[in-house]
Structures are given as structure tokens and as C-alpha cells.
Amino acid sequence: MKSTVITLLFSLFICTSNAQIVGLSNEQIAVLKRKIKDDPEAKSLYKNFKAAAEDFLAQTPNPVDTIRTEGLLRGNPKKERTAIALRDINKMYTLALQYKITGEEKYLKKADEFLLAWANRNQPNGDPIDDTNLDKAIEAYDLIKDDVNPKDKTLIADWLKATALAEINSKRMNRNQGTGINNWNAHRLKVVGEIGYALNNQEFISWTIDRLKKHIEINLNEDGTSHDFKERDAMHYHIYDLEPMLRLALLIRSAGGGNFYTYESPKGSSIKKSVDWLIPYIKGEKQHEEYVNTTVKFDRDRAKNNEPGFGPGTMFKPSLALPVLKLSVYFDSAQANLLYTLNEKGKDWQMLIDEIKQNK
């Protein structure tokens, strides 16, 4: 019955206009501007954001032809080169958002320059662990897609479309095992969904929603555990699996497509149950030693490479769950106090943006 309701809701929102869903809408930008003007905390956060945007105006794009992070150990030259290049992603997003806040063309031109540089050079490889780094590039495009010239818009949109198609057509995606059902698939769905909403591509959106239902059934268990937790014996991967699903669920809800947080698969699994299962570990009521019984060689390789947090027996740190809580709180406000307690650094700029996005 729940599946039928969500399908019906999807049929209703499929006709929505090409408005911003991934990035802030014009109405939400207006809310942000009022907060910057009237709210001391928002004004303080904006001061640093504004300074960064100003600094990025003097910088030049540094794209890579292929993003390479997945399966590589710290210190690998390809991974290090990619890490440097990926700094561009936040730059283009910051410039795009600053343009929407100020209306100053210099920020639009620079954001466009960064996006075009990546669109012209980067070749999608269909690896979601690599492509998951493009969140802010997709959001940057969504923010300025109505303001760039048609030629540039087409070039950038074609790059994003190629990225989504590489994910959809990946042979590894089509297997009902391994990376076809683990955290890779969660990140794949998030990327294709974000691109679908940014491009208003209903085929991508429909594909994503259909496979999210399947992923919730295959990857999550009715007791709240996940395939990734059982495979890796690590909360780290339970969280890494939930975060993209939550981000996607928020997008779908924002577009009027139903609540995938509480959606239950035929076997009774749900994102909500898997977040709830995590809560006692976040509160410190339960503890977990990470990676003790992992079945994945890469985890052992990272431990041998002395990468922090990957040694067998490392105690799970509740603060590592912040990426989940910062999103799940918008489905379950009862988590707000826990988030406040855990988030020792206080509200940051991204939390302010998320708050505006979700508080309709």
C-alpha cells in the first residue's frame, strides 16, 4: 500500500516545472538573504562564505580527465591528484551561490568558467564512489542553469547527462551482488537522482525512484542493520550507505515525490529503521569495534597503510554519524537535541542552507 501511495505521488510531481530542486530556489534564496541581513549567526557564517567566494574569483579551474578515488590507498598519486582537482567543486558551488545572493555577474561568469572546464575535460567512468564527489557541481549547475548562455548550459548539461548514463549503464550496477547492492549503489542512485532533478530528466528520476525501492529492500534489513554493516563490520559503512539515501530521500520529498524515509520494503526494511538502529551507538549506549570481522581486503589494506580509523578494533566514534543526523533530523525532529549535543562545532554554513531547504 505504501509503495502504491508513493508511486501515485510520483505521477503527480512528474509534471513539475524545471525549478531548482537540488539547489536553493529563488524563494529560498530570498529567505537566505533575509537571514544574512537580520540574523547575527547567519551574518557571521556568511562573512566567511563571502570571503571564500571573493578569493575564488582569482583562481583558475584545475579539472581532471577522470576522477580516481575509489579503491586507492592514501598516498596514491592518482588519488592525490584527484583530491587537488576536486577542490574546484566547492569553488564552483560557492561562486554560483554567491551570484544568486548578490546578483553580481562576476560570480556567475567564474562559476560558469569552472563548470565548463570540467564539462570539457572530465570523462565519466561510471564509478559512483568517484562520482559522489560531484554533488556540489550538480548543485552549482542547478543554481545558475537559467542564467548562463544556452551554449554553455548545453555543454554542462551534456556532461552531467553523460555522468548519469555512465552510472546507469555500468555493468557492475546491473549485478544483484557486490557493488550492485552495497553502498556503491546508494551513491549511484543519489548521483543519478541529483542529475535527474537538475536536468528535469524524468527518465533519470523514474529510474532512481524505482531502484531506490529495490535498494531499500536488498541493502537494508528489517532489524535496522545493513548489508554494508554485515559485510564490513563497521558503522562507518552503515553511515556511508545511509547518507546518500537520506540525501536522495530529501530531494524526492522536496519535489513532492513522497516520503522514502518511512517507506517500507515488502520485507519490512526502511531507512528510518536503519537510522533508528544507529541511535544507541550515537548516544554511547552501545559500543562497536570497527572492522574486526570485515570480509573486504581493501579494509585490511588501509589498516596496513596506517590510515586513521581503519585499524581492526578501532572504537566507533559517535561524531562520525553527523552526516546522517544532519539529514535525518529533517524527517524526525526528535533527533534535534541529539544532533545539537553531538555537533560540538555548532551550526555551519551548510547546515544553514539545509535548514532553509527543508523548512518550507
Language model segments and positions:
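Bacterial Sec-dependent N-terminal signal peptides
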Residues: 1-20
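Intrinsically disordered and other compositionally biased segments
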Residues: 6, 11, 63-64, 68-71, ...
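Extracellular glycan-targeting catalytic surfaces
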Residues: 18-178, 186, 222, 251-256, ...
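Short amphipathic alpha-helical face segments that pack within enzyme cores
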Residues: 90, 191, 243-247
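Loop-centered beta-sheet repeat module
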Residues: 174, 178, 182-198, 202
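Long, repeat-rich segments with strong aromatic
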Residues: 199, 203-289
